[in-house]
Regions:
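Short loop-to-alpha-helix "cap/lid" segments that border enzyme active sites
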Residues: 173-183
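C-terminal segment of classical bacterial N-terminal signal peptides
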Residues: 2-9
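Transmembrane beta-barrel domains of Gram-negative outer membranes and organellar outer membranes
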Residues: 10-164, 168, 183-191, 195-197, ...
Length: 250
């Protein structure tokens, strides 16, 4: 789920959604808060709001350990989490940068994330909902060193280990695919950034936006997440969100 011009000062774990080629420095921490309102909202019922605080701590040998606590709020309740208005999850995660070449602008990372519901599991029409799954990924990044504002590109595979097909892939049948990212500095403090998970599933979004470096080791990102199934069934899903977040390294 970052500005290339600030990589010497920051080492964020994601661009918007996909893992970046960075890891937080050993002994440092990174906190982020994401806010995503569904836009446009559904024709009937309440729109969804996503709140996601994230904490990452840098470990030895270019590793990092983190935890996300995303919560999806929808007035009127959600059958997938026992009709609660808020579906909460916890996502411990780990990332390792196993290769880097600063002179060539190259890095390779791999990682894993465990997605587990906090509201407990339930069954709807005999089908288990709100299951636990694991995300595994790899990512290659290349910084193109042309002038002061060369871009950085990211690409790699991902796969999800999930025992229940109907849960993770509720809008499709894709349990893996590719991740792509692009970070283009526009000035010393502003960059255009975009990332994409392929597939019609929980992660399947394209998100372009702007990243702004702030004083005090802070960062603000604003973008728009477009679900890969967004216009399916005559636009019935409206699977699109404004994506806002603030992050700070400490």
């Amino acid at each position: 789920m970052f500005v290339v011009a600030a990589q010497s000062a920051f080492a964020q774990s994601t661009i918007f959604n996909i893992p970046s080629g960075d890891t937080v420095d050993k002994g440092k921490g990174y906190f982020e808060f994401d806010f995503l309102p569904q836009a446009p909202g559904p024709d009937a019922g309440s729109r969804i709001y996503l709140y996601n605080p994230r904490l990452v701590v840098g470990g030895p040998h270019d590793t990092e350990f983190g935890v996300n606590i995303p919560a999806f709020h929808q007035g009127g309740g959600n059958a997938a989490c026992n009709l609660s208005s808020t579906c909460g999850y916890i996502e411990p995660n780990f990332k390792w940068k196993f290769y880097k070449n600063d002179d060539e602008g190259l890095s390779f990372v791999t990682g894993v994330l465990l997605h587990t519901p906090l509201n407990g599991k339930t069954t709807v029409a005999g089908v288990s909902q709100n299951e636990t799954w694991g995300l595994f990924y790899g990512n290659f990044t290349k910084k193109i060193k042309t002038g002061d504002y060369g871009p950085r590109i990211s690409a790699g595979p991902y796969v999800v280990a999930d025992s229940n097909l109907t849960d993770f892939t509720s809008v499709g049948a894709h349990r893996g695919g590719v991740i792509l990212g692009y970070e283009q500095p526009l000035s010393k403090k502003v960059s255009f950034v975009a990332d994409w998970y392929s597939g019609k599933n929980y992660y399947g979004y394209f998100t372009p936006g702007i990243s702004i470096t702030l004083p005090g080791n802070g960062l603000f990102n604003a973008g728009y997440s477009i679900g890969n199934d967004s216009w399916a069934n005559s636009n019935a899903t409206k699977n699109r969100y404004v994506f806002l977040y603030y992050g700070v390294t400490f």
